[in-house]
Amino acid sequence: MIDAAQVDHLARLARLELTPEERQSMQADLNSILGYFEQLRAVDTDGVEEMQRPEDLVNVLRDDVPGEVFPPEVVAALAPEMQGGFVRVPRTVEAE
């Protein structure tokens, strides 16, 4: 399991300054996490088929078919401002 020296090493790598209480807490937390991995490692998985996820997900796609197109007059009536037959919108990207 993880000892205090390893916790200190990890703290230095992560540039953390731990108090003695935080060091003890971190050591206990890391040992708990590693203990959980040991439990997982002990599970017999022989004969279990590998999978990426527990459910078979399938994308439901629709055909890309053009729908109703609004006449230019309707678009112009809905737009706040038109310029040269196009809808004018506020600038969203500033030039560098």
UniProtKB/Swiss-Prot annotation:
Its EC number is 6.3.5.-. Keywords: ATP-binding, Ligase, Nucleotide-binding, Protein biosynthesis. GO terms for molecular function: asparaginyl-tRNA synthase (glutamine-hydrolyzing) activity; ATP binding; glutaminyl-tRNA synthase (glutamine-hydrolyzing) activity. Coiled coil: none annotated. Pfam families: GatC (PF02686). It catalyses: L-glutamyl-tRNA(Gln) + L-glutamine + ATP + H2O = L-glutaminyl-tRNA(Gln) + L-glutamate + ADP + phosphate + H(+); L-aspartyl-tRNA(Asn) + L-glutamine + ATP + H2O = L-asparaginyl-tRNA(Asn) + L-glutamate + ADP + phosphate + 2 H(+). GO terms for biological process: glutaminyl-tRNAGln biosynthesis via transamidation; regulation of translational fidelity; translation. Heterotrimer of A, B and C subunits. Allows the formation of correctly charged Asn-tRNA(Asn) or Gln-tRNA(Gln) through the transamidation of misacylated Asp-tRNA(Asn) or Glu-tRNA(Gln) in organisms which lack either or both of asparaginyl-tRNA or glutaminyl-tRNA synthetases. The reaction takes place in the presence of glutamine and ATP through an activated phospho-Asp-tRNA(Asn) or phospho-Glu-tRNA(Gln). HAMAP family: GatC. Belongs to the GatC family. NCBIfam families: gatC. This is Aspartyl/glutamyl-tRNA(Asn/Gln) amidotransferase subunit C.
